[in-house]
């Protein structure tokens, strides 16, 4: 289910990231959690591995986005909780599940925060004369007070490696790129 008024959604743990992104966009929302593996990984996997996404600067990590979840324990018992406000006493056992890799049970679904889709998305690249200048830029950007949702600094070796991993174009796409 999706609750637009309270900006929450209940999503099955096996839902693949790319499908979550597409379905929430229909309603004008995003979870904001997009790890590098978003095309193939699942919500339950993100919780079990304590995943961090490319847009964590704006939306937070998975533990900041998940409000609650259902868990099937080793004895087959389904743990289901109501969404409650933060409690100020003792440890929060729900936090132990993040990064537990399934040791405390299997996550079956989660209730997550939703955010409105951004009005504008811009992508670009900046070249620096050396890596140190790039690090200085990243430092200044972080201290401006309004960090971008996603920013990444890569050196030339990493860039060349990632380009080498891209599949070669074929057919019409290959012909078009030669023009």
Where are the regions that the model predicts?
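FAD-binding subdomain of flavoenzyme oxidoreductases
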Residues: 1-152
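Terminal amphipathic helices with adjacent charged low-complexity linkers/tails
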Residues: 149-179
